[in-house]
Curated annotation (Swiss-Prot):
Record text on subunit structure and interactions: Monomer.
Cofactor(s) needed for function: [4Fe-4S] cluster
Positions contributing to [4Fe-4S] cluster binding: C353, C413, C416
Catalytic activities: (2R,3S)-3-isopropylmalate = (2S)-2-isopropylmalate
Protein's UniProt name: 3-isopropylmalate dehydratase
């Protein structure tokens, strides 16, 4: 049977096919950061479980850390001034030490954004399964990997078992034919695609990008496209590996060498779709139709060419769509039918896991060389990793940016999501190379326009959104694959180990388990059979996770206490904290709501933060009814004993109308019926998920019953794909030898 790329990679990782179509799959690579991991490690500790495969796990700090100079860095406690941010970062370090994992901390010469360091180290490889508690894990699909974001419960599941329970997604192909026009980058392609299919267009799918425009891209450009696939609603995005991929990986620190490398490449060359493979959805786009693109609203699907205008409200027939556009324009502060070129900006941000690599910085530097940013603009460049930063500095890019008036920063997520000191002030408008333009994403009241690095650089010089094709471009020498080996002088704080080196003691140093607590342990959930109570009606489309729980509330190491943060920017004034009595959850009846009825589609789009269902649970809402859900949020609900129900629009509107009267609604999971005074409505739910909810079952405990099958798969994996095992792996958990912070005078030998 002909297979797609996704089919091939998925099938090579199936350990056990279970009833109801669920599969237990093996995870090859796990990336960990400070925001979505504390509760997972605490769950392991409470259950007395070790990390199964430390050799397949790599951790770093990126979201919370300041990107200010680190010349005087001593330790996290003194460097990070925000207490909750410092706590998360210190907690990660403690967990790394306790469980014996490889860690690129702030004192390490290889620290950076998780989705930058994985590829540049060769940790990401073709044909692998890659996960991280971060939605933009889709980035790694550029290598032909099946890479997707997961919530904290699944982070714990992977740490404990190196597996996940998954149901096969649909196959979607996006084919971009022809060569891109001058000034058009992979970021423009990605934004254009999202504009065509919408932020829910890829829901339930794994997207395979192909066609001349995609296949001719460099690896770093491919990463940008796959990074943005989550913004199209997809579970993952993939591009088949080829000679461009192999050249990029050759000699990377963690890539195989010699005969093992040849064997790996031979396998990787089989990872492409068969000629007669069938796709559930195919979208064809002409590259010639794509221009330099910019967002105008508060969703990545709100896009237009730089030569275009904001939507004309009078021409939108659908009243719900017109209302959504009006809300977006009101927030972004631009009138209907306004030309995008010439919109004045206040800040420029070049960085994020989407666009912070050397190929992103080079074209931006070429735009600004010999020029100055507009007087009223604050501009910053944040390299994606310490290695990218040093590579750029060797090329003199830092000097070019600084002479043009840009602030040259240290590596980190920075202004992408405003969990650190790099934030927009209320009303400030930013030309940003990041991936989301949600309300308040870069700072409360901040306004974000997504675009390419070259377009962002041009906006900084002109002081407004501008067409990069009208800018003079300086010549800067940038060759293709320059990053496999980085000769970096180690600092006194550099704890650079021989990565994945095994020691005599192969047992992770797990701290003694503590008694399990309801707030931390994942050793079971409250059973969900029936739920009766008030149902709060909500008529908003594309409710994103930033709206559900803003980024400032993610700085916690517990699962509880987040109910007060639920829909914070809608329930309260973000600046004063005053209540908004007009919001539904502030109405007396719905303060006690146990069910939410949303009549707008694509509920829960955005990040993988499991803090969103935690906030609902803490508030008291355990069931959400909506026309459709974003994949990761949908999955996270079940992991937390919540029931997301998909119903047709007409039925939802009828239930919402009854709920508005203040009557109670009952959800009967056993019978799969929603009851309200207006009648009964049946709903569908996957049998396995229903079984787990009704019985309050723990996924990890269920998976542990498959220990023999997991071990058998690992034996096969070592024999068939030996390059996937960490160095020193001999069938046991491999403890990593950390240098311990001793000063190393010699250059690092990668």
């Amino acid at each position: 049977m002909a297979r797609t790329l996704y089919d091939k990679v998925l099938e090579d990782h199936i350990i056990d096919r279970q009833e109801y179509g669920t599969c237990l799959i093996y995870i090859d690579r796990h990336l960990v950061h400070e925001v979505t991991s504390p509760q997972a490690f605490e769950g392991l500790r409470n259950a007395g479980r070790p990390v199964r495969r430390p050799d397949c796990t790599l951790a770093t700090v990126d979201h919370n850390i300041p990107t200010s100079p680190r010349r005087n860095f001593k330790d996290i406690a003194t460097f990070i001034k925000e207490g909750d941010s410092s706590t998360q970062c210190e907690t990660l370090g403690e967990n790394i030490e306790a469980f014996g994992l490889t860690y690129f901390g702030m004192e390490d010469s290889r620290q950076g954004i998780v989705h930058v360091i994985g590829p540049e180290q060769g940790f990401t490889l073709p044909g692998t399964t890659v996960v991280c508690g971060d939605s933009h894990t889709s980035t790694h699909g550029a290598f032909g990997a099946l890479a997707f974001g997961i919530g904290t419960s699944e982070v714990e599941h992977v740490l404990a078992t190196q597996t996940l329970l998954q149901k096969k997604s649909k196959n979607m192909r996006i084919r971009v034919e022809g060569k891109p026009s001058a000034g058009v980058t992979s970021k423009d392609i990605a934004l254009h695609v999202i504009g065509v299919i919408g932020t829910a267009g890829g829901t339930g799918c794994v997207i395979e990008f192909c066609g001349e425009a995609n296949e001719s891209l460099s690896m770093e450009s491919r990463m940008s496209i796959c990074n943005m696939s989550i913004e199209a609603g997809a579970r993952a995005g993939m591009i088949a590996p080829d000679d461009i991929t192999f050249e990029y990986l050759c000699n990377k620190p963690l890539a195989s060498k010699g005969e093992e490398w040849d064997r790996a490449v031979a396998y990787w060359k089989t990872l492409k779709f068969d000629a007669d493979a069938q796709y559930d959805i195919t979208v064809d786009i002409k590259a010639s139709d794509i221009a330099p693109t910019v967002t105008w609203g508060t969703s990545p699907q709100d896009v237009a060419p730089i030569t275009g205008k904001t939507p004309d409200l009078d021409s939108i027939a659908d009243p719900l769509r017109r209302l959504a556009v009006q809300r977006a324009l009101d927030y972004i502060g631009i009138a209907s039918n306004t030309p995008l070129e010439g919109v004045k900006i206040d800040k420029v941000f070049i960085g994020s896991c989407t666009n912070s690599r050397i190929e992103d910085l080079g074209p931006a530097a070429a735009i600004v060389k010999g020029k100055r940013v507009a007087d009223w603009v604050d501009a910053m460049v944040v390299p994606g990793s310490a290695l990218v930063k040093r590579q750029a500095e060797r090329k003199g890019l830092d000097k070019i940016f600084q002479e043009a008036g840009f602030n040259w920063r240290e590596a980190g997520c920075s202004m992408c999501l405003g969990m650190n000191p790099d934030q927009l002030k209320p009303g400030e408008r930013c030309a940003s190379t990041s991936n989301r333009n949600f309300k308040g994403r870069q700072g409360a009241g901040g306004r974000t326009h997504l675009l390419s690095p070259a377009m962002a650089a041009a906006a900084g010089i002109k002081g407004c959104l501008t067409d990069v094709r009208h800018m003079e471009v300086a010549g800067i020498a940038l060759t293709g694959n320059e990053s496999p080996r980085q000769e970096v002088v180690a600092s006194k704080y550099d704890g650079s180990p021989e990565v994945f080196k095994s020691t005599q003691d192969t047992t992770p140093a797990v701290k003694p388990p503590q008694p399990a607590s309801d707030s931390s342990s994942s050793g079971g959930m409250p059973a969900f059979t029936t739920l009766k109570g008030y149902a709060a009606p909500l008529d908003i489309s594309n409710i994103d996770t930033d709206m559900i729980i803003p980024k400032q509330f993610l700085k916690t190491i517990k699962r509880t206490g987040l109910g007060s943060a639920l829909f914070y920017s809608l329930r309260f004034d973000p600046q004063t904290g005053a209540e908004n009595p007009a919001f539904v959850l502030k109405e007396r009846t719905f303060r006690q709501a146990r069910i939410l009825v949303c009549t707008g589609p694509n509920f829960g789009c955005g990040s993988s933060r499991e803090h969103a269902p935690w906030a609902f649970n803490d508030f008291g809402i355990r069931c959400i009814l909506a026309p459709s859900f974003a994949d990761i949020f949908f999955n996270n609900c079940f992991k937390n004993g919540m029931l997301p129900i998909v119903l047709p629009q007409a039925q939802l509107e009828a239930i919402a109308a009854e709920a508005q009267k203040g009557v109670e609604v009952e959800v009967d999971l056993v019978q799969q019926i929603v009851r309200n005074p207006g009648g009964e409505v049946s709903f569908d739910v996957e049998e396995f998920r229903k079984h787990c909810l009704v019985n309050g079952l723990d996924d990890i405990g269920l998976t542990m019953q498959k220990a023999d099958k997991i071990a058998q798969f690992e034996t096969k994996r070592t024999q068939t794909w030996p390059w996937l095992d960490g160095k020193g792996y001999k069938g046991k958990a491999t403890k990593i030898e950390i240098n311990g912070g001793q000063q190393k005078k010699a250059k690092l030998d990668w």
